[in-house]
Design a protein with these regions (language model features):
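Sec-dependent signal peptide hydrophobic core
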Residues: 4-9, 332-336
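Hydrophobic h-region of N-terminal signal peptides that target proteins for export
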Residues: 6-18, 341
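Domain-terminus/edge residues, biased toward the C-terminal soluble/receptor-binding domains
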Residues: 147-148, 157, 163-337, 341-356
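Active-site-adjacent loops and short helices of periplasmic peptidoglycan-processing enzymes
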Residues: 18-173, 183-184
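Generic hydrophobic alpha-helical segments
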Residues: 7-11, 68, 118, 149, ...
């Protein structure tokens, strides 16, 4: 009986105490939290480790576009020419066609909500004339913002590099600086990064839905951007404002989307309590925005939710779904725990009876 009891206790020790244990064990490559009112660092862990930003870098695209709008060289209502180079981009997209015309602002929404790589390329060509010219603008802006030499942009979209190409590189600290500067220079940024849904085209119908699951789930969250491809892991730049305090968190290189989102939520909530408070307007509401104008016919495509899959070269829409069978494992653990508890109870009761 003693041997049986020892075996049962050993098995019980092997049952995980919590399904969330991996979050605290190895949640990310690096992370940082900034006080948006003062710029002070409230938390950092591996904040200078270089990693791949993936689609998060589209916030730099937005920065450059909004800079040009403020300067007057670009208008939000300007029509954007769609070229074959634009329509051949893979990954997450809105499937732009050379027969179509969309405005700068419509493509900005596609950039932030759908994480559309074709929209990123279209905006890059519209602003700079060439892809390489826009990438130069990105790196010049990085220097202007005082980002470290580690941060190097090689593309307007953040897709995995092809043969002979170099990857986009940044650090959590540099990217948090970028986000802070973007919000300060262009408060209207939050109008785009807080949008969770928008109809991009009417015929055939194409609806865009955000990849940022913190929106609508974390009170006060109004941005900013997620990123993912296989080698990059799951990353997010997020911001929350409550009661005059605002914090920005960047989490890079998580091995799982849920781990990334849980860690970002934890950091935002914890360090918002330590942030300075100044009078500020309420956060931008994450509301359904009006549909874009109808464009020329485009091929019917699957929605982003239907295009999940880790093998796709897509920095956001390929966030793989949770593996099937997770609920069965949970039920199995519960049943195993109940069985072990019953066996232990019977063993103890038998020992007491024998001892009388």
């Amino acid at each position: 009986m003693k041997k049986l009891l020892l075996i049962v206790l050993a098995w019980a020790a092997m049952v995980p105490a919590s399904r969330g244990a991996p979050i605290s064990r190895d949640p990310y490559l690096g992370a940082i939290v900034l006080d948006a009112n003062t710029g002070a660092v409230l938390f950092e862990d591996g904040a200078d480790r270089p990693g791949y930003p993936a689609s998060m870098l589209k916030l730099m695209d937005l920065f450059i576009v909004l800079d040009r709008v403020k300067q007057g060289s670009v208008r939000l209502e300007d029509p954007v020419l769609i070229t074959k180079e634009v329509s051949s981009i893979g990954g997450s997209q809105v499937y732009l066609d050379p027969r179509e015309k969309f405005t700068v602002e419509e493509l900005v929404y596609a950039l932030m909500i759908q994480s559309a790589n074709d929209a990123a390329m279209a905006l890059a060509l519209h602003v700079a004339g060439t892809r390489d010219g826009f990438v130069r603008m990105m790196n010049e802006k990085a220097k202007e913002l005082g980002l470290s030499p580690v941060t190097q942009f090689q593309s307007p979209h953040g897709l995995p590099p092809g043969a002979g190409q170099r990857p986009d590189i940044t650090t959590p600290r540099d990217f948090a600086k970028l986000c802070l500067a973007l919000i300060r220079a262009h408060p209207e940024t939050l109008k785009y990064t807080s949008a969770t849904f928008r109809v991009f085209r009417q015929e055939p119908l194409f609806e865009m839905r955000t990849h940022n699951r913190l929106l609508g789930n974390v009170p006060g969250c109004d941005g900013l951007k997620t990123g993912y491809f296989t080698d990059a892991g799951f990353s997010i730049a997020a911001t929350v404002q409550r009661d005059g305090a605002r914090v920005i968190a960047v989490v890079m290189g998580s091995v799982d989307r849920k781990v990334r989102d849980a860690k970002a939520t934890e950091l935002l909530g914890r360090y918002l309590l330590d942030a300075s408070r100044t009078p500020a307007p309420p956060p931008a509401p994450a509301v359904r925005t009006p549909p874009a104008a109808s464009a020329a016919a485009a091929p019917a495509v699957a929605t982003d939710d239907e295009a999940q899959g880790e093998d796709l070269p897509d920095p956001d829409a390929d966030e793989p779904a949770e593996k099937s069978g997770g609920w069965l494992k949970s039920v199995g653990l519960v049943v195993l725990g109940a069985f072990l508890a019953a066996v232990v109870g019977m063993a103890i009761q038998r020992r007491l009876l024998l001892g009388r």
